[in-house]
Amino acid sequence: AWLAGHHDVTLIRKDCINGFVGAIEPTFKAHGTSHNRCIDWVNAHRLQTIVTVGICTDICVMDFVLTMLSARNHALMPTLRDIVVLEPACATYDLPLEVARNLGLPDTAAHPKAETHHMGLYFMASRGAILASELQGL
């Protein structure tokens, strides 16, 4: 809430796993056209770099970053060069296999924290995101 009133802040309600998809707003519902508040924000401010943080590294953060990379690569944000993931400001959850089974969940519900965090970072970096341990010098 402390940032909500700042003139350089754009708040986008996140109502789905992928914040980029959640930022799509229908303009003319009858015509199926829309715009995206993330793209609008990057373009309005002519941003060259965005920094992404959040929970869960391998789910929400990764989906948003990979979609932003694709949108950038398709020239939807002409000034955007770098999408940075600040690793210390990202995290994910731990759900050991035994706990998943005890809860009556399928084995596929298991979510080993260290491995899935690493996998999320790996996939983002392999597609072009910059992984950073600090923001100094960016």
Language model features with spans:
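Active-site-adjacent betaalpha module
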Residues: 1-138
